[in-house]
């Protein structure tokens, strides 16, 4: 038996769980900075559960599909600029330029507004900072969790400042309702699915 846990910096340990005398396996896949690096953790889980050959085969398929899509994006003659996420409270958490999502934008050959950022995680910024840098982005990608799909009226009602974005005005906002779509469950192990979607959005030709 073992307990699989995601480690967090400065967490001070695992409290009472450490006293159960059951081995703890730290699964740090979410800390990877490339989509394929994160997906490759399926090989570790394959070893753990005795299905290594199947896991290796699946990762090889994911890797092959991802590389093929990446090459296709490089052949595109057009590329949209992109900004992502929504304001949460007083901060807008944008993916760092070296984060998994930031590098996915790069592999999709999109012009990410914060591509020059050096963080590997999310970066909390003021709304004004995001608007100044990404207000003219061609495409805006948002994730949310709601009972029903968001509309432009919902975005405006949530925060009037959203209406100033070019992508809002041109109706070029793409949303993923994580209450209906298994985004967080699927994309860590099938980043090629997400890359394919990004390429279709950022290279409409």
Model regions: which residues?
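Alpha-helical segments with a strong preference for the paired helices of cellulosomal dockerin domains
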Residues: 1, 15-19, 151-154, 161
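Extracytoplasmic substrate-binding proteins
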Residues: 2-4, 10-90, 115, 180-205
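Short, structured coil segments at secondary-structure junctions
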Residues: 20-21, 108-109, 169
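C-terminal soluble interaction/assembly domains
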Residues: 114-116, 120-205
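Flexible, glycine-rich surface segments
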Residues: 64-65, 69-151
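Local beta-strand N-terminus motif with an aromatic residue
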Residues: 1-2, 137
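Short, surface-exposed alpha-helical segments at coil->helix boundaries
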Residues: 11-14, 39, 94-102, 159
